[in-house]
């Protein structure tokens, strides 16, 4: 079975845009691939500076993924920082990676343009990402179109290592481009993103979830008048309902005497129904953090055994003599 690897940054609370953009597809993949899913806590240090926030986010991300269906019996879930061989390999790869390659990174240039202070971690982010992928001989890496360049850089780094040391050591991973056709609009109509503060969080309390849904921006068409059915509420509603339900909502908008508030209530109910079992499961998992720790520890043991074997071979290739005691 081919191996799939995905990194999940604990950078904040997950929302329905994350779910339909990547999470759901990760879950669907686990029946067909040997899935490795790691919490990219080292990567998150390029943007998170508060220790308590990182700790809280890390547990929350694991809870979210377990709740929506990531199965530890099918997939391996682990912490990046629990496998120090990632950073060991990063150093080996750093010595054959041109600085110019890193400076041309779209993500790096975009963050600098936004005024984010440049530091070594931000610049060398793709080298650590390459190590994350290459150390497990990953066959595929599910990525969005905006992340494809990072995987291309991983392939470039792997090829350069293989060429420099005249070996066929690192497998060249293939991208599995995630379907982003269902771009989820946020409450303000832009793409849903934590950066825009326009998210709807599927695991929020019912009160908070209602506040988020009710904050969806609409026009000022009076209650009694027909409304354009191609609106934000309808677009989000379509993610949770079949075509018949979508057509029913459309007819209500066109008929008039159906307000946006009514539509938002129907959307809220759809979200609660869709994520009902996941919300219940998450509440149960919150009461059993020891189980969450167990899942992470077991995953880290498994992956570290693989990583140790790979890094030892890499050290031998570059001429490091290893343990002499």
Give the location of each predicted region:
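N-terminal Rossmann-like or analogous alpha/beta NTP/dinucleotide-binding catalytic cores
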Residues: 2-131, 279, 283
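A generic structural motif
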Residues: 10, 141-142, 198
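Conserved nucleotide- and phosphate/pyrophosphate-binding catalytic cores
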Residues: 18, 149, 155-325
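Short helix-capping/linker segments at secondary-structure and domain boundaries
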Residues: 99-103, 135-142, 241-249, 279
């Amino acid at each position: 079975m081919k191996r799939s690897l995905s990194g999940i940054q604990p950078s904040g609370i997950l929302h329905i845009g994350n779910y339909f953009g990547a999470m759901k597809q990760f879950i669907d993949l686990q029946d067909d691939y040997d899935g490795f899913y790691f919490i990219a806590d080292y990567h998150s240090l390029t943007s998170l500076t508060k220790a308590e926030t990182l700790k809280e986010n890390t547990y929350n991300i694991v809870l979210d993924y377990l709740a929506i269906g990531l199965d530890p019996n099918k997939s391996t879930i682990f912490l990046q920082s629990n496998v120090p061989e990632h950073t060991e390999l990063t150093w080996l790869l750093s010595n054959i990676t041109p600085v110019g390659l890193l400076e041309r990174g779209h993500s790096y240039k975009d963050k600098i343009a936004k005024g984010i202070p440049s530091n070594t971690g931000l610049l060398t982010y793709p080298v650590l990402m390459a190590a994350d992928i290459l150390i497990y001989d990953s066959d595929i890496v599910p990525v969005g179109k905006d992340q494809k360049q990072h995987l291309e850089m991983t392939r470039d780094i792997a090829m350069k290592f293989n060429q420099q040391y005249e070996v066929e050591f690192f497998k060249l991973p293939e991208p599995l481009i995630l379907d982003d056709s269902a771009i989820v609009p946020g409450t303000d109509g832009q793409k849903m993103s934590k950066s825009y503060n326009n998210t709807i969080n599927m695991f929020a309390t019912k009160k908070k979830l209602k506040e988020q849904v009710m904050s969806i921006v609409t026009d000022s068409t009076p209650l009694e008048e027909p409304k354009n059915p191609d609106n934000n509420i309808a677009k989000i509603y379509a993610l949770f309902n079949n075509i018949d339900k979508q057509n029913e909502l459309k007819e209500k908008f066109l008929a008039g005497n159906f307000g946006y508030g009514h539509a938002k209530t129907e959307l809220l109910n759809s979200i609660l129904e869709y994520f009902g079992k996941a919300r219940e499961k998450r509440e149960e998992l919150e009461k059993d953090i020891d189980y969450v720790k167990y899942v992470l520890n077991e995953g880290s043991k498994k992956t570290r055994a693989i990583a140790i074997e790979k890094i030892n071979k890499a050290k031998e290739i570059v001429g490091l003599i290893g343990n002499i005691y």
